[in-house]
């Protein structure tokens, strides 16, 4: 059996550059690991492959489930035939879904790391990355975490030096936002010329120079998202934004105490709020390290 943490992420800015011929969008974003995480348990056993979560029960074994896709793609990559079997995956969910925090992608990457260790520890890193890319745009980032710039449809990841740690108030509304819907709204409302072609100078010292192109179109349909971003700024956040395609928003603070004070100020009905912090590459590796139990 293997236990592994699956940390969430936030997007520090997200620029949509254009819509590609394959239907995906060309993007550029800074992805940052945070301490909030799910816990994934992988057990080798006889019988069919199962994927379940105590909070939702059995999960679908199809392309709507990134964890199942990881199991299936890795199974094929190591030369096995037929339907995957002999493994049970249990996911203890803490990361809100449809929130732009990358929970499903991080779970998939955690299962991939665990299964490589259990099934094929000598598998080449390039093949592991190929499996990650084939499953989802964000999955490659979660193989290593930390701070990185992601381009292409999000799968081209280049590691960056870790940012100075900051604390976050993450606010999650009672509704989720579909990634497909968010990009469809952008297609109808925006022009690629409106997006930045390069990261703004000095962004590491001034995160408020970064923008999320999707925030504005999503807030058109859900005004409360923009209102919560404003509340976080008023509460003292040095930078506040929606993450990914939403629906979660966050504010950055220099200390845990400041984040806790802000959390009390921005609480309101219909929103879940929590305090967490960013993770350096080393902290991500320590948190996401496999615990193997025979």
Residue ranges and their predicted role:
Residues 1-99, 117-126, 163, 172-175:
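ATP-binding N-lobe of GHMP and related small-molecule kinases
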Residues 142-239, 254-294:
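Conserved, helical-rich catalytic subdomain that frames metal- and/or nucleotide-binding sites
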Residues 90-119, 137, 238-253:
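Glycine/serine-rich anion-binding loops at beta->alpha junctions
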Residues 14, 38-42, 138-142, 148-149, ...:
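Short beta-strand scaffold segments in enzyme catalytic cores
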């Amino acid at each position: 059996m293997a236990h592994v943490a699956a940390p969430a992420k936030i997007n520090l800015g997200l620029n949509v550059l254009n819509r590609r011929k394959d239907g995906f969008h060309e993007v550029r974003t800074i992805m940052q690991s945070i301490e909030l995480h799910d816990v994934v348990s992988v057990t080798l056993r006889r019988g069919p492959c199962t994927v379940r979560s105590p909070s939702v029960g059995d999960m679908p074994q199809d392309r709507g489930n990134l964890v199942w896709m990881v199991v299936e793609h890795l199974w094929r990559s190591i030369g096995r035939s037929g339907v995957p079997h002999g493994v049970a995956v249990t996911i203890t969910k803490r990361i809100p879904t449809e929130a732009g925090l990358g929970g499903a992608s991080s779970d998939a990457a955690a299962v991939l790391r665990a299964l490589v260790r259990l099934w094929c520890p000598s598998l080449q890193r390039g093949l592991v990355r190929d499996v990650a890319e084939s499953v989802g745009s964000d999955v490659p980032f979660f193989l290593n975490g930390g701070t990185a710039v992601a381009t292409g449809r999000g799968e081209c990841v280049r590691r960056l030096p870790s940012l100075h740690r900051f604390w976050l108030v993450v606010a999650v509304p009672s509704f989720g936002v579909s990634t497909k819907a968010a990009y469809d709204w952008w297609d109808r409302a925006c022009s690629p010329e409106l997006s930045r072609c390069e990261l703004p100078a000095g962004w590491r010292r001034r995160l408020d120079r970064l923008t999320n192109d999707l925030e504005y179109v999503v807030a058109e349909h859900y005004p409360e998202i923009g209102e919560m971003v404003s509340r976080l700024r008023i509460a003292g956040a040095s930078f506040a934004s929606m993450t990914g395609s939403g629906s979660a928003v966050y504010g950055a603070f220099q200390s845990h105490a400041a984040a806790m004070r802000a959390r009390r100020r921005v609480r309101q009905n219909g929103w879940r709020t929590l305090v967490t912090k960013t993770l350096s590459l080393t902290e991500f590796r320590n948190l996401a390290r496999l615990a193997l139990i025979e």
